[in-house]
A protein has these predicted regions:
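Terminal, non-catalytic domain-edge segments
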Residues: 213-238, 246, 250, 254, ...
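Conserved, compact domain cores that house catalytic/ligand-binding motifs in diverse enzymes
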Residues: 15, 254-316, 320-329
Length: 516
């Protein structure tokens, strides 16, 4: 299944194209190629074959785009230049009346490959390309641009692929008949989508006059890659009360530096199906992926943490972290098709291959980051995906695993409570509360039977898992804020007192679990 969306803007000479493919089969889907053609005329013929170009630009070892180019003695048919200094000179040599072709990519300064007389030019991004480029940017905000342009004596258009480097493999080419945009170029890298997986990609078509300068075309392409982001001061968020109160009266510099370092230090994994997610090395070395890398699937709602950081600091990159990770989540980490109704709309637990051989449990499904994404962007897919996850949680709570208090650890129903409470706040639909009341009642019974929120561990032990108890406390706290009751308040206090008494170490840290 595929969905194409065209977004046009009043009075603007560009359109945005999004293409989303969904594997609605029970088998893996190997994508041989995925190419869009923008032709100069209806009769034009463009192939996806890429002509080898013998151009040695040199590696940008400094990461600053300092390598200079000299085309003063080059008469074509192909010119390579970095930055905008030589563009005026080359534009005179490559007359648009005889068809000028261009492909361009950037790290700092943009590198242009320009053809005259309709000469084919192309650029390919693959893993080898990326490891040879010194890029120091926060790539969620900006890595570089990737575009192709066709201009003749009558018209011109450029096509920019959004975050192409991050979502490799990608290729573009410009020739005498128009432009080819290769979202999956053939024979460059294997792309295999698992059953139920989706992927959305986007590009911009910018129509322009033959007189428009290349630096202006480049400028619009760069803006597409790094658009302005709105900014609201943290005190406005605090006064509005639309988020939990994470806005201290006085900020502690060491604490703020630590939070920013954690956000900025998250690992980034490139690739069309990987961008926005990360490999969890701890799970991987434990063997949870059977020897293969285990993808975290945004555990535990990393996008929500980014949204809170953006709201409390106003720092733009945290919003971009939210957008990139949420888009991956909506496509890759959620099941869009399955013959098993218990999987439809649900979120996969961390696993190898993103979802391959994955399972779904309440402790690994969350929605707050998706709702944040919806609020910040207006993209209703965030809202719809959150609703789908909530529906899946309701189905899972009916399964035998969750019917006896204490047989699952505290985070299982704790995360379910947090998800359902967030959806009630968002929708004001009472259907989300039915299981909330049931979970609260189970926590009470659990405490009465075991004395505290103990979790089954080995066959002969039940232990405190401080981390999981804290998740349950945080979830019950969110419910209590909406429906304050003294019995719930006292249950929260008893759980925290138990953690402090039994899980708090002399060095000021809480241990993860009691055994081993």
């Amino acid at each position: 299944k595929a969905v194409i969306k065209v977004t046009a803007y009043s009075g603007k000479p560009w359109v945005n194209i999004t293409y989303r493919i969904i594997n609605t089969s029970d088998d893996e889907l190997k994508i041989k190629s995925l190419v869009f053609y923008i032709k100069k005329s209806e009769d034009s013929v463009i192939t996806e074959q890429l002509k080898p170009l013998k151009i040695a630009a040199g590696n940008d070892s400094t990461g600053c785009g300092d390598i200079r180019t000299d085309n003063s003695h080059n008469d074509g048919p192909v010119f390579m230049t970095r930055g905008t200094t030589e563009l005026d000179m080359i534009e005179k040599k490559a007359d648009v009346n005889n068809i000028r072709t261009v492909v361009a990519t950037s790290n700092y300064k943009t590198s242009f490959i320009i053809g005259k007389n309709g000469e084919e030019v192309n650029e390919v991004i693959d893993d080898k390309y990326l490891v040879k480029e010194a890029n120091e940017h926060f790539a969620e905000v900006f890595y570089g641009t990737f575009m192709a342009d066709y201009t003749d004596g009558e018209d011109g258009f450029s096509v920019t692929v959004h975050q192409a480097q991050q979502n490799y493999p990608k290729a573009v080419k410009s020739c005498s008949e128009g432009v080819a945009v290769m979202l999956v170029p053939e024979n460059v890298w294997e792309i295999t989508m698992q059953s139920g997986m989706a992927k959305e990609q986007q590009f911009m078509i910018h129509f322009h006059s033959p007189a428009m300068k290349l630096w202006e075309i480049d400028n619009r392409s760069l803006i597409y890659q790094m658009p302005d982001r709105p900014y609201i001061a943290p005190e406005v968020f605090k006064r509005a009360g639309v988020m939990i109160d994470v806005f201290p009266v006085k900020y502690n510099d060491d604490f703020e530096i630590s939070l920013m370092a954690k956000a900025d230090g998250h690992s980034r994994c490139y690739g069309m199906l990987n961008w926005g997610d990360t490999v969890d090395q701890g799970y991987t070395v434990q063997g949870r992926g059977g020897g293969k890398p285990v993808w975290s699937n945004n555990e535990y709602d990393y996008p929500h943490a980014c949204a809170l950081m953006y709201a409390r600091t106003g720092v733009r990159r945290f919003m971009d972290y939210l957008i990139v990770s949420a888009k991956h989540w909506m496509d890759i980490d959620v099941c869009h098709y399955s013959s098993n109704p218990l999987r439809i709309g649900g979120q996969w637990e961390h696993t190898a291959g993103h979802c391959k051989n994955g399972v779904m449990v309440c402790s690994h499904e969350w929605v707050e980051g998706l709702l944040d994404y919806y609020h910040f962007t207006g993209d209703k897919r965030g809202y719809d995906t959150a609703i789908g996850i909530g529906e899946n949680v309701l189905k899972l709570l009916e399964t035998p695993m969750y019917q006896v208090p204490g047989e699952a650890n505290a985070r299982e129903t704790g995360w379910a409570l947090r998800t359902l409470t967030a959806l009630y706040v968002e929708t004001n639909d009472n259907k989300w509360l039915v299981k909330c009341d049931w979970i609260i009642d189970n926590f009470k019974k659990w405490e009465e039977e075991y004395g505290d929120w103990l979790s089954p561990y080995t066959d002969n032990t039940a232990i405190r898992v401080g981390f999981m108890i804290s998740i349950a406390v945080g979830s019950v706290m969110r419910y209590y804020r909406i429906f304050p009751r003294e019995d719930i308040r006292q249950m929260i206090l008893r759980a925290v007192d138990d953690l402090t008494e039994n899980c708090y170490m002399d060095n000021g840290l809480f241990y993860y679990k009691e055994l081993p």
